[in-house]
Structure formats: structure tokens, C-alpha cells
Amino acid sequence: GLVITRYGHDVQRPLPDRKILVCEAAHPVPDEAGLQATKNLLHIVQALQKDDQLLVLISGGGSSLLTLPVAEISMSDLKSLTQELLRSGAPIEAMNVVRKHISAIQGGNLGRLAVRAGAKVDALIISDVTGDQPGDIASGPCAVDDSTFQDALNILDRYQIGPGVAPASILDYLKKGTIGQAPETLKRDEPESLMVRNHVIATSMQSLLAAQKYCLEQGAQVHILGDQITGEAAQVARDQLEIVRGYVEQNQNKDFADRPGKFRRQVFISGGETTVTIPQGVVGRGGRCSEFLLALYAHSKDLAGLSALAADTDGIDGSEENAGAYFDQEIIHHANTLQLDEKTYLDAHDAYGFFLEVGGLVHTGPTLT
């Protein structure tokens, strides 16, 4: 067997006779190590025989780690496009439509290859996307795909990644696909699609329910705002603050005490996949969760006693090594003492830098999801 994971995430746990090779590669922008690891995986699939069973474990990050561009597209061009997509503010589902159509392994191609070799295929999937659709997770290496080459071109156009920005090799290949000169992703009417089974075994909502259970055990009252939250991270933060403010205003004259003199804590929990649009010329540091939290901090000065945490369930938020960030009254006091201007950090998309200064970064290491 073979595992492809992010650099630093090979936990070196004992494996029976070490028959499972662990390869590390880059995320979120793919690299040559990921390309070689994916080629190794392809060799395993090509060696399958009739009635073999292929078990595929899929989780977030696979769109980058499992990387094998079609022959017409170089790794250099794939890296360039990935960087543009990440800066564009496109939601992950849209990004993955493009990725599927320039990949020899995603968009159901892994499943298709295994079935054509005569194998039975089961994919066990941990979802990190809204909607929990197998085709959206890691760009769906074993899943059917309803999108088209034209959809991919439309997405690049919508996010202004057209000629002069996207590599010409990629635009040319996508255009060939629209006129039938390149193979489509795995479709529902293909016989191979019936031989691949996808099972989503963990979702964002399960994480929210686990957090809810813990908070209830601590005596708090919990409000789940949903597990399908999308949009620009900073705007989502402002929207959720309005929900909190509305709750406070409606209930400020009510007694929510568990017992006289002690008010019950209120906890608001949400999950989803936000986006961050990075303007040209801005480098930025951090990820969606950290930016969400910095915007929440910047716009919540009127809410006394507020504490907040935002983190990725896989332990990595964007470009750095932190899972996310948090703030409480001590962090707020420290930021005020340092006289940091959170708006400057927000404009620079440097949430990582802000929370590094105030000691609010959250580090979990690999969570193995």
C-alpha cells in the first residue's frame, strides 16, 4: 500500500512489516514529490488483477497531494494555476472542477483505471467540504463528476484567470476538451461508475456535534449555526457576529442562570469552507480560519466577555503550520498593550502575523484526518 501526506505528517507509527510506504509532498501547491508519489500509486493500480480489492482512503488536501497532470500540461504550469486559484477567492468546489479536468488521476480517473484492470473499488472518505459530496473531496479520484470542460473554462473566466494569467497549455487543453479532443471525467452513464463505491465516513457536522457534546458537559448552552458556511472569511465573521449580537439584544433582560448569581455561558459553533481573496501584489500569511478570527476580533469590540477560536480539523490552516487561532480577554488585553492595528493586518491578509504577536496561534500538529 501507499500513503501520500503533507510534509511533516508521517507520524511514523509502527506498520506491520512496513508494507505501507508513506510519501510526503507539498500542500496546498503541488510539487514534484507529490507527482512521483502519485506515479508510484498509479503503478500499484496498473498492477491490479481481476477480482482484486482496492481500498482507497481519501481526505482533505488530496487535490494537491495526489497530483498527476495530463501529459499535455507540465508540473510548472499546474503549480502556477494552483497559485492563481488559491488567490482568486474561488470556492473549493469550483477550484476542483478545474483540477479534475486537467488531471489524469482525479475526476474519477483513479476509480476508472482500477475497474478497467478488473478490481473492485471502495473509497472511504473524510469530508472537509460543504455538502460532503465525494466528487468535491480531494477532487474526487474515485467519484463520478457531472461538470464539464466548459464549466472549467467558465470558472477560470469568472475569477479572471484567463489568457495572460492561466498557462496557455491549460487553456488549450480545456478548449480541446470542449470539442471532444480530450477525455472527460468519469460520468454516471459509464459502466465503470457502477463498480466504484464511495463511503463518506466523517463530516464537518460530526465535528460540530462532538464540540457541542463537550460544551454541554461543561454547562454551556450551545447554538449550532450550521456546517455549510461559505463565503469570504472576513464577511462570514461579520455575519456571525450579527447573529451573536441579535441573540444578546433579545435576551439581555432575561435570567439564564443555572442557579442564582451564575449566568450560563453561550457557545456558538459553525463549520464550513470559507474563502480569502488575495489581491495581486499581496503575499499574505495564514489561512481562512485565522483570517475569519482576526475579522471577528476586529469587529467585536462592543461584545464584552467574548472569546473565540477558529481552526481547521486537519491541523493546518493555509500557508503556515498552525491549525488556526484564538482570542480571549488575556489576548485582547495583550493586543491593546502592544497597540496593534488589526485593520493593517487584515488589509495585508496577515492574520498569522497578528496572532503570532499576541500569542494566539493554535498548534495541534497532524490530527490524522
Predicted regions mapped to residue ranges:
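Short beta-strand segments
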Residues: 2-5, 56-60, 86, 123-129, ...
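Accessory alpha-helical/coil subdomains and C-terminal extensions
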Residues: 118, 122, 144-239, 243-246
